[in-house]
């Protein structure tokens, strides 16, 4: 899907790691939510509450999921992060991403 229709977009950005990761939240008519953002090169550790499906549009990064080894991803690609977990990122080039939050079957 190249574009989203009939959505509400948060005006304010979520800014993490001194601006190295930024995103904007979008909400769909069915209540589901995604974020659209970028990650600049660096190393980061993030937490999840809900399962996240990370859709990498472009860029190169390595991901360390719980109880796994580092895996390299080159966009376009997708990977899943389990709910209630911490994961690490090594971002090697600007990453353009869309994150889908899976909760309550949505």
Predicted regions, residues:
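Short solvent-exposed loop/turn micro-motifs enriched in small/polar/acidic residues
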Residues: 17-19, 46-48, 72, 80-82
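Short acidic-glycine-tyrosine-enriched beta hairpin
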Residues: 66-87
């Amino acid at each position: 899907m190249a574009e989203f229709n009939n959505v509400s977009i948060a005006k304010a950005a979520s800014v993490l790691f001194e601006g190295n990761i930024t995103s904007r939240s979008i909400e769909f008519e069915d209540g589901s939510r995604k974020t659209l953002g970028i990650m600049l090169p660096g190393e980061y550790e993030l937490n999840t509450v809900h399962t996240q499906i990370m859709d990498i549009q472009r860029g190169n990064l390595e991901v360390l999921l719980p109880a796994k080894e580092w895996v390299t991803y080159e966009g376009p690609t997708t990977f899943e992060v389990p709910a209630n977990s911490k994961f690490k990122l090594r971002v090697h080039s600007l990453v353009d991403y869309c994150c889908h939050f899976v909760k309550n079957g949505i």
